[in-house]
């Protein structure tokens, strides 16, 4: 590729594709997971690049992925709706696609929520030289920011199957550095929702919705105390009492996490409120940064013994995470129980994404 010709610097994979005679813009024929996708119809930023770099694909390359390729969408349509426009595939449609033999799962993806003023939408093409792709080169990432506006942020995407996977365990934080927004040094936090047993999560820290006296007698608090062993309750007793909305840490005992952050969401046996839940979430995030944590599991504060409405708690907690300016923290997992809780937190994250795009 010649820089003098004014073309963007492509990644090494895209360069090999060009050398082999393939096209990085014409349906991503050289990439088995992307064959047959009309990328330009769903990713304007990628279309803007591929329009100037596309060349006819070599005859040998499309055959590599012919057996696994999804049929290309017609011009101006999306496979999810078949109608004109850029409507996102529904979750049900994505799961149906994953169940079909021979269908590539990269078409059905979910965008993880991210903090900040803007997060990108669904991007099913995912080629290496797409500025919305997590594999995009820094040069093309800069180009993508200029195409999408000054508040462009790159969000990681994951397959629909992985997003909806019901699991009692999850991996710890990856060693990658945090992404930053153009024009500042504010890090993003990945937001995830999992139906999971918080006591089994292999993260840097998990949270406990506690009372001000740190007596872990019921609900999630009791489960954490049992899993952590007697040392956890002993440390809690030494640090009690704490004020409403405050947070303190203890070791995690026999659990795989390093710390348990206890956030006081109510008095012993008493109700809670939206202000307390917001303050407790913010205090938990600050404590995680103080401890140098990169990954954190949050439980639904105040929705058990506290009796606070689930949808309201999800909205308040997600909002508090979005407003937080992290130090070391890169990943927040909402560990919930039941489909209703998963829907509530997923909807709160999606609502934040929609608001950020407006």
From Swiss-Prot:
Describe the location of the Macro domain by residue ranges.
178-353
One Pfam family of this chain: Macro
Q: Region labeled Disordered — which residues? A: 70-93
Question: Record's InterPro entries?
Answer: Macro_dom, Macro_dom-like
Q: Where is the composition biased (Low complexity)?
A: 70-88
Q: Which residues form a coiled coil?
A: none
Q: Which PROSITE patterns match?
A: MACRO
Designated name of the protein: Uncharacterized protein Mb1934c
């Amino acid at each position: 590729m010649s820089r003098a010709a004014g073309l963007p610097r492509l990644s090494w994979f895209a360069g090999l594709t060009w050398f082999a005679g393939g096209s990085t813009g014409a349906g991503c024929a050289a990439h088995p997971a992307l064959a047959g996708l009309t990328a330009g119809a769903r990713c304007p930023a990628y279309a803007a690049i591929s329009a100037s770099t596309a060349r006819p694909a070599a005859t040998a390359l499309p055959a590599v992925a012919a057996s696994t390729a999804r049929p290309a969408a017609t011009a101006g349509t999306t496979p999810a709706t078949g109608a004109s426009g850029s409507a996102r595939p529904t979750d049900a449609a994505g799961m149906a696609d994953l169940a079909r033999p021979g269908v590539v799962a990269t078409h059905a993806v979910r965008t993880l929520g991210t903090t900040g003023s803007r997060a990108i939408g669904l991007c099913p093409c995912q080629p290496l030289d797409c500025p919305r792709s997590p594999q995009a080169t820094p040069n093309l990432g800069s180009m993508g920011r200029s195409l999408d506006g000054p508040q462009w942020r790159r969000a990681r995407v994951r397959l629909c199957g992985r997003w909806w996977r019901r699991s009692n365990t999850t991996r710890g934080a990856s060693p990658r550095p945090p992404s930053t927004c153009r024009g500042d040094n504010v890090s993003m936090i990945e937001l995830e929702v999992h139906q999971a047993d918080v006591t089994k999560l292999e993260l840097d820290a998990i949270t406990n919705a506690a009372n001000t006296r740190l007596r872990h007698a019921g609900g999630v608090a009791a489960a954490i105390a049992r899993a952590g062993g007697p040392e956890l309750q002993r440390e809690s007793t030494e640090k009690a009492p704490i004020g409403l909305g405050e947070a303190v840490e203890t070791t995690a005992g026999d659990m795989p996490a390093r710390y348990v952050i206890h956030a006081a969401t109510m008095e012993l046996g008493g109700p809670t409120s939206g202000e307390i839940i917001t303050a407790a979430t913010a205090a938990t995030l600050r404590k995680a940064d103080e401890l140098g944590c990169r990954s954190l599991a949050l439980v639904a504060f105040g929705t058990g013994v506290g009796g606070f409405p689930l949808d309201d708690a999800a909205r308040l907690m997600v909002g508090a995470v979005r407003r937080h300016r992290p130090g070391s923290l890169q990943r927040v997992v909402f560990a919930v129980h039941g489909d209703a809780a998963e829907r509530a937190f997923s909807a709160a994250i999606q609502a934040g994404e929609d608001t950020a795009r407006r």
